[in-house]
């Protein structure tokens, strides 16, 4: 990566486990598309800041990309992704192994809120929160559109089969794990 000379250039490691709890496919009817096809689904009509908790949580597609470690180049400020996943990420389901206690176990975990989504610039372009923030539609593979939580995996959007655990990897070796696919592959 141009301008990324050594791990000593790293300003910090960014981790986030955001809304990657249990499968919420049918957890709450309020979060699901409306039964009346003439009506628009909530994500097209309700602003992010006005969504209920269940609506907000259902926007998470379960890709696990937000749970990848990221580094910042001190010289450029560029956020660079790694293929190293948070220690709590289940690599098969792409969900947090301890969603309820994630902040206690991973203090650097960031919670997505309507306010933080406005401020966080590193969300992947496939992320529903970022897409809706930017006035873009959900993509075809999103579980709210497909009705199937597995389409995120079938479309190759999730981190399944593409990541390693951060456990035991010193920050000095993060440079060996840099990847671009979290921000270049969207499934559009």
Predicted regions and their residues:
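Short loop/turn segments that flank or connect secondary-structure elements
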Residues: 28-62, 71-188
């Amino acid at each position: 990566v141009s301008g990324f000379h050594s791990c000593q250039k790293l300003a910090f490691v960014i981790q986030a486990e955001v809304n990657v709890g249990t499968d919420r496919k049918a957890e709450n009817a309020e979060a699901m598309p409306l039964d009346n096809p003439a009506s628009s689904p909530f994500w097209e009509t309700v602003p992010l800041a006005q969504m209920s908790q269940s609506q907000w949580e259902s926007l998470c597609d379960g890709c696990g990309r937000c749970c990848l470690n990221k580094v910042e180049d001190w010289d450029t400020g560029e956020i660079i992704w790694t293929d190293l996943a948070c220690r709590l990420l289940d690599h098969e389901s792409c969900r947090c192994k301890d969603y309820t206690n994630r902040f206690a176990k991973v203090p650097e975990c960031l919670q997505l809120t309507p306010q933080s989504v406005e401020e966080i610039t590193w969300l992947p372009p496939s992320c529903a929160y970022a897409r809706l923030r930017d006035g873009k539609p959900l993509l075809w593979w999103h579980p709210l559109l497909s009705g199937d939580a597995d389409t995120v995996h079938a479309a190759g959007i999730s981190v399944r089969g593409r990541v390693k655990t951060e456990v035991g990897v010193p920050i000095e070796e993060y440079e060996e794990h840099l990847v671009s696919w979290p921000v270049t592959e969207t499934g559009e």
